[in-house]
Amino acid sequence: MSENLSSFKGFEARKAAWEVIQAVGGGAFADVALERTFNLYSFNSMDKALITELSYGAIRQRYFLDCWIDSLGKVSAKKQPPLLRWLLHLGLYQILKMERIPPSAAINTTVELAKTHHLKKLAPVVNGILRSALRSKEKGLLLSKSNNPSLELAKNESLPFWLADELIAWKGVEAANKIAQAFNSISPIDIRVNKLRANLKEVKEIFDSSGIQNQVIPNCPYGLEVRAGVGEPRKWPGYVEGLWSVQDRSSQLIAPSLGPLPGEKILDACAAPGGKSTH
C-alpha cells in the first residue's frame, strides 16, 4: 500500500503544502513560500487551490493545532521535531477543519509523507495522533476547557493569548469571539480598477463574461470584490494589460480620503511596494 499512496490524488499537493508550512515555520513569509512552491512544481489550478487552503489554513490555525497535539501526544507540540510538528499540523487541519476531505485520505497521505520523508520511525506517532483526533471529533470531544475566557478564546480561535485578553477586555466575550472568528475567515480578493486604462463597468463585464464571480464594493468607486478560490489573479483577464491591481478595500479608501490636488507633493512613508501611492 505504501508504494502506491504517492500516486493518490492530492498526495503531491499535500507534500507541497507541508513544504510551505515548514518554510513559514522557519521564518519565511507565507505568500513568498507559496509562490516559490508554485514556481518549483507544475500544479493545475485545483491542486494550487488545495495547497493554498492547506498551507494557509494550517498556518492560521497554528496555536489551535498545537493545543490538539498537546492534548493527544506524549510530547508537547513545541518540543516535537519541527518536521513532525508541521506534518501533524497538516493532517490535523484536514481532520478538524476541512469537512470536504475524507478523514481516511487525510490520515493515509499524512502517514505516507512521514514514511517517505525522513520520519519513517515516527509514522506510528503520526497515525496514532491523527486517529485519536478523528475519534475525538466523532464523539464531539473538544479541547479541555478552562475557567479563563481569554485562554479559551486563544485556543479555539488560534490567537495569541495577549490578543485574546485584549479583545475580551475591549469588547467582552461574545463580541471578542465574533471578531476572532472574522480573523480566521477566508477573505475575498479586492481589486482596484486602473481608471487611466478602464472603468469599473468595463472590468466587471470582462470578469462576468469570464465566469469570475464578482460584485461592486460599496463606497469604493473603483473597487470589485472577487470570490476567493477562483484561480491565480495574475491569470485573470485584464491583469497583464494593467486594467486593475489587487488592493484591499481599506487601502482603496486612503487616497480619496486624502483628497490630493494637482501639483501637490505627497510622501507615502509606508510604501511597500506602493499600491496606494499609485492610486
Predicted feature descriptions by range:
Residues 1-234:
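Class I Rossmann-like S-adenosyl-L-methionine
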